[in-house]
Amino acid sequence: MLVRNLKYLSYELSRRLEARLWYSHVHYNHHDRRFELFFGGFGKRCDKPLEIYVSHAHNTWKDSSMTVQLVLNDEVLDSVVIYPGEKFPEHWFESLCSTLGLIRDSDIL
């Protein structure tokens, strides 16, 4: 479930952000049990990455709730908890895109 939701998150962000940001890479932090998705400015090196942390509550991904946080310069801008069987809430995507719309390019480049 987590992997499927993570792929959905990446797809939805790419689609909704209309190439304002490009997806840089994903890293799995085993110690904190979280994925770290890094984004940057399109066509530019990412000096101050926009990060999306996706952490899960248990050792296994199946039937595990997830916490998703939008982080810029170590400040949490938005977060949501997604429970097993849920899709990413539509209102969170709207909130995320609205938050990203307030971020100036100079904040992330």
Where are these regions (language model features)?
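Short intrinsically disordered terminal tails
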Residues: 1, 102-109
